[in-house]
Swiss-Prot record:
Involved in transcription antitermination. Required for transcription of ribosomal RNA (rRNA) genes. Binds specifically to the boxA antiterminator sequence of the ribosomal RNA (rrn) operons. GO terms for biological process: DNA-templated transcription termination; transcription antitermination. InterPro entries: NusB-like_sf (IPR035926), NusB_fam (IPR011605), NusB_RsmB_TIM44 (IPR006027). Transmembrane segments: none annotated. This is Transcription antitermination protein NusB. It comes from Pseudomonas aeruginosa (strain ATCC 15692 / DSM 22644 / CIP 104116 / JCM 14847 / LMG 12228 / 1C / PRS 101 / PAO1). It comes from the Bacteria. NCBIfam families: nusB. Belongs to the NusB family. Pfam families: NusB. Keywords: RNA-binding, Transcription, Transcription antitermination, Transcription regulation. GO terms for molecular function: RNA binding. Residues 1-21 are annotated as: Disordered.
Length: 159
């Protein structure tokens, strides 16, 4: 669990924070894709993204956390969602793989973010960046994964 978890998990972030996190996720998935494809060092990718993009409305700390947290936990993240896949990990589209890793990271480490938000954000990222119908694949995987990682939240009917 991240040390940035909210003291009140039921509290909703302010609207501006929600938009800033959405932008952070969007940039993070692009940066993770670059990392997966080019293997460039994370600090170089982060510097490039911060230089090339307007971060005034981006949750920069969240972008940093995702960009560095996902690669650090890559093996654990992959083994967490791999049982939910309908094909071998090596056959997953690189964009969808970046989205699944990001979403799995949030489900595992950011319990302050409701599971429904994580799933919805993953779907929206796949609609924006993924292949045709990639959002359906991402939705299917995350729908199978959420009960395994957020069982108490689902049972409680929260969020």
């Amino acid at each position: 669990m991240s040390n940035q978890d909210s003291g009140n998990p039921a509290a909703k972030p302010p609207k501006g924070k929600t938009a800033a996190r959405r932008k952070a996720r969007s940039l993070a998935v692009q940066a993770l894709y670059s990392w997966q494809i080019a293997g460039q060092p994370l600090h170089e990718i982060e510097a490039q993204f911060r230089t090339d993009n307007d971060f005034s409305e981006v949750d920069g700390a969240y972008f940093h956390e995702i960009l560095h947290g996902v690669p650090r936990q890559k093996s654990e993240l992959d083994s967490t969602f791999e049982p939910c896949l309908d094909r071998p990990l090596a056959e997953i589209d690189p964009v969808e793989l970046a989205i699944l890793r990001l979403s799995t990271y949030e489900l595992r480490n950011r319990i302050d973010v409701p599971y429904k938000v994580v799933i919805n954000e993953g779907i929206e990222l796949a609609k924006t960046f993924g292949a045709t119908d990639g959002h359906k694949f991402v939705n299917g995987v995350l729908d199978k994964l959420a009960p395994r990682l957020r069982a108490a939240e689902l049972r409680g009917g929260k969020r």
